């Protein structure tokens, strides 16, 4: 079995730096589009056989060191009593946004086996199909990011409704985030029970907050999630996008591995979160549109900053873009494996 990813999560030595890509199963791949042209996005998520096939495509095509379940962070919402749909080119639309204490009271905590059985079934099939070739990562949204969709009614630039509820009705805010946090714990524990060998918690939009607001309104709920996952013994990755101004707080919330975006310098960020945990990242996803020699140089720079310290997982600083040339994604995996196999002295000369 290729267990380099799991070893890196535990900060053990590996022969090379493991690499996988956020959103690695996606629209930049022709194989994905063949399926996507026949089915809606939600049909793909809710049909285990399709989710399995799409999860496996980048493992076969790119040679990545981990598979990540094909799903969406909003899937648990239906079980919480919140309807949503995906509008073409618009992203998710929440049908009944939560904006008052009355709305919050109606939100339920999920029962994963009843509410998202298709996710758990896909994980079970994937473990059989992967047959130990690479580990399988499960995932969920973080409490703040899920709350931002639920309150705003979809994606947002300024998060006005979200921040308004947070500041005007803190009791309602904390009750809502408490329910989301408990749902997240149940969801991830169910994924782990079904066979996920690591999980990632995506806090994609938390960068909209000041460090003070994060600490007061979000950190306790994120910490609840990470504290409750410790007993599973499975590595947990905490990815907080655009959170360079509050990495100490993100690390305080928890996670065995802290995911970094490209806006921070990996060496300084690792020092900030502490060498007692791993880091994941952190190539700018747009670098995959650059010439191969530029990709190679950027990979080299990141690996030098990691300094051959055990516990680095190579990834992009956010999801891969849909227009990315697939051959550049393949090249990225090759060059990470090649350069990270060198000694530090050889890497400097490469």
Curated annotation (Swiss-Prot):
GO biological process terms held by the UniProt record: protoporphyrinogen IX biosynthetic process
InterPro entries recorded: UROD/MetE-like_sf, Uroporphyrinogen_deCO2ase_HemE, Uroporphyrinogen_deCOase
Location(s) in or outside the cell: Cytoplasm
Keyword annotations: Cytoplasm, Decarboxylase, Lyase, Porphyrin biosynthesis
Gene Ontology CC terms, in alphabetical order: cytosol
Pfam families noted in UniProt: URO-D
Cytoplasm keyword on record: yes
PROSITE patterns: UROD_1, UROD_2
Top-level taxon: Bacteria
Reactions that this protein is recorded to catalyse: uroporphyrinogen III + 4 H(+) = coproporphyrinogen III + 4 CO2
Residues carrying the site annotation Transition state stabilizer: 72
Residues noted as binding substrate in the record, renumbered to the chain: 23-27, 72, 149, 204, 318
Gene Ontology molecular function, alphabetical: uroporphyrinogen decarboxylase activity
Cystine crosslinks: none
Enzyme Commission number, as recorded: 4.1.1.37
Pathway: Porphyrin-containing compound metabolism; protoporphyrin-IX biosynthesis; coproporphyrinogen-III from 5-aminolevulinate: step 4/4
Complex formation: Homodimer.
Function text: Catalyzes the decarboxylation of four acetate groups of uroporphyrinogen-III to yield coproporphyrinogen-III.
Entry similarity comment: Belongs to the uroporphyrinogen decarboxylase family.
UniProt cross-references to NCBIfam families, sorted A to Z: hemE (TIGR01464)
PANTHER family: METHYLTETRAHYDROFOLATE:HOMOCYSTEINE METHYLTRANSFERASE RELATED, UROPORPHYRINOGEN DECARBOXYLASE
Protein name: Uroporphyrinogen decarboxylase
């Amino acid at each position: 079995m290729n267990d380099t990813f799991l070893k890196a999560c535990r900060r053990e030595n590996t022969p090379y730096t493991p690499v996988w890509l956020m959103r690695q199963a996606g629209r930049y791949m022709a194989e994905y589009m063949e399926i996507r042209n026949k089915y809606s996005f939600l049909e793909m998520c809710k049909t285990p056989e399709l989710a399995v096939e799409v999860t496996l495509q980048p493992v076969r095509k790119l040679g990545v060191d981990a598979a990540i379940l094909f799903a969406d962070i909003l899937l648990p919402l239906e079980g919480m009593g919140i309807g949503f749909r995906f509008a073409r080119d618009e992203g998710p639309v929440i049908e009944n946004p939560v904006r008052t204490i009355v709305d919050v009271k109606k939100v339920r905590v999920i029962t994963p086996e009843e509410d998202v059985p298709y996710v758990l079934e896909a994980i079970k099939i994937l473990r059989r199909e992967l047959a130990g070739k690479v580990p399988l990562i499960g995932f969920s949204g973080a409490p703040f990011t899920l709350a931002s969709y639920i309150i705003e009614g979809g994606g947002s630039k300024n998060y006005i409704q979200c921040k308004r509820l947070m500041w005007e009705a803190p009791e309602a805010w904390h009750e809502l985030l408490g329910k989301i946090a408990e749902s997240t714990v149940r969801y991830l524990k169910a994924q782990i029970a079904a066979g996920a060998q690591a999980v990632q918690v995506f806090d994609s939009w938390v960068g909209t907050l000041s460090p003070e607001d994060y600490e007061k309104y979000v950190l306790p709920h994120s910490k609840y999630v990470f504290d409750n996952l410790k007993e599973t013994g499975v590595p947990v990755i905490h990815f907080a996008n655009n959170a360079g101004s509050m990495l100490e707080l993100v690390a305080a919330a928890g996670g065995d591995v802290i995911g970094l975006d490209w806006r921070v310098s990996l060496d300084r960020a690792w020092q900030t979160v502490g060498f007692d945990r791993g880091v994941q990242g952190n190539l700018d996803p747009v670098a995959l549109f650059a010439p191969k020699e530029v990709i190679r140089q950027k990979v080299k720079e990141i690996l030098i900053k990691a300094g051959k310290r055990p516990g680095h997982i190579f990834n992009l600083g956010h999801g891969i873009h849909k227009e990315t040339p697939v051959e550049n994604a393949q090249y990225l995996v090759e060059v990470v494996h090649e350069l990270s196999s060198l000694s530090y002295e050889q890497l400097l000369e490469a």
